[in-house]
Amino acid sequence: TKFFTEGLGVEPTVTGLDSAANEAMRKAKSLVQGFKNHLEYNELHSASKRLTEAYAVGEFLPALQTVSTAERRIILEYIRNGNALIKAMDVRDYAQAKNILESLKKRSSDFDSTKAEGAIAAFMRISNGHIRAAQMAMVNGDQAGFQEELKQATQVWPTNPKLDEIDERLDLLLDNSNLAK
């Protein structure tokens, strides 16, 4: 009674408690129905939100018991892929992030990819620009400029495949210069 009196400012009654319980069950049922409707149309982002809201109302309510394991699994995999995208972006693995993003877009018709796509494209372009500047510095014999631009490219996108290409070219150049000696 202290919870109701201090928190809500009213004395609990059987009718009030019954009304609150019925409202919670109605809300959970409505959210589960919304979840299933979104799932039917492959709107996984919205479906995951409705399912989360339904669980927040009450995990053990009867309406939530109607959600099958297969339906929960679809949402779990969607959330895991979303988390994998965030992790790939955090470690600046933009090639992997791009693959995960494409997978999410194919799986969910309501996934908003614009922010992630913009960030991936920008960071890839910045890294590639630094690589291009490094190559220009190398052509002009500016070793310090080459090293600085390569460092910048690596900081922006450490797994840029063009960095491997530069390493291969440098190895070939070094091998050829050793043969000439």
State where each predicted segment sits.
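Amphipathic alpha-helical assembly segments used for oligomerization, scaffolding, or translocation
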Residues: T1-K181
